[in-house]
Amino acid sequence: MFCIICSVRYSNPKLMHVGHQYMADNFDPKTFTGLIEFKSFHITPDKGLGIFTFNNQTNMQKHLSDIKSFNKDYEDRFSCKITLDTGIANPDLYYKA
């Protein structure tokens, strides 16, 4: 499994909730071919994390520019910085009940 990891840091923590509502209303992960799951986490009042898991590297690479484009608009709207990384899920340390 291949992942895109988005680390988000808000300059104003009060915008995180508003940003998440915007994302829930305007972002449709079902349009991404090969997307297995998308998870979002609150880490601290001003930090969040999103993880997109794809079935293969080709599908991950295909949607990387779409996610970067959405993130750029999101950064401008909600006064935050998004750092994007890619990685591979370790099947030996991946557990899903």
Features from the language model and the residues they span:
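Short S/T/G/P-rich N-terminal loop/turn motif that feeds into the first structured element of a domain
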Residues: 1-49, 55-69, 76, 80-97
